[in-house]
Amino acid sequence: FQNDLFNLSIVRQFADEGEFADVLKDYRETGRLLFALAISEPEAGSDAMNMQTYTRTVDEHLILNGRKTYVNNGEYAPYIMVAAIARDCEAPGKYPPMTFWLLPRDLKGVSAYPINKIGQSMLPFATLVFDNVELSPAYRLNGRQEGFRQLFRLLEFGRVFTCASSLGMARAAMEDAVAHARSRKAFGVQIGRFQQIEQMLTDMEVSIYNMSSMLYRAALAVDNGGPDERLSVALMKRYVPDAA
């Protein structure tokens, strides 16, 4: 669900109203997204501006080339949402021109290779290779196009979602610890009555309060787009996963 929320946020920003309505309608009817999100590359993870996947017109055909990695559901989703540099309209500036494309996974030239992971087995990842994939102009998402500036802000949403998962795991661990402290007995009494156990549970509760505060503050900053957005998200990202 967290992955779906993030993917829908991306579509909402880069698609026009009609394109987003089609994706949302299908999601409401089926409960699953139809596409995999392909942004990260082997040499362009956090350094997204080093993206090498590109589109270029060759003999009047629009061609996509490149490689994406850590693509969720990359082997199974019928469509792929790909971020690529538009080589046809390169211009001087801080940010290279970037566009998003929603294309069928079974296009000629698209290959998927599974990534073996230790955890998160419910969400399979894959590496995707695009080898001279011919694109139709209809595959391009035609919503508001602010390129990397827009993408960087959306990644802040993803960091909030990830830290929310960490907070959820911490709360689940707290509930398990409290349940065990109430059910386990030693010397004829519940171990939760021992001062050392009480202190451990108190420290856990303090950490959860701190995590909640930082998460909600960062989420509010992202929603409002305030000047402290990047700082709030960075502090949350630094503290919450480690505390969990």
At which residue positions do the language-model features occur?
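Flexible, small-/acidic-enriched active-site or ligand-binding loops
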Residues: 50, 106-136
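A short, Trp-centered hydrophobic/proline-enriched beta-strand micro-motif
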Residues: 30-40
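A short core secondary-structure module
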Residues: 67-111
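Hydrophobic, small-residue-rich alpha-helical packing segments that form membrane-like cores
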Residues: 45-47, 62, 103
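Glycine-rich phosphate/pyrophosphate-binding beta-alpha loops
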Residues: 44, 69-75, 157-161
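Alpha-helical interface subdomain recognition
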Residues: 14-17, 57-62, 127-129, 153-244
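Internal helix-loop-helix
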Residues: 1-31, 72-79, 222
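Long, acidic (Asp/Glu-rich), low-complexity accessory segments flanking structured domains
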Residues: 131-149
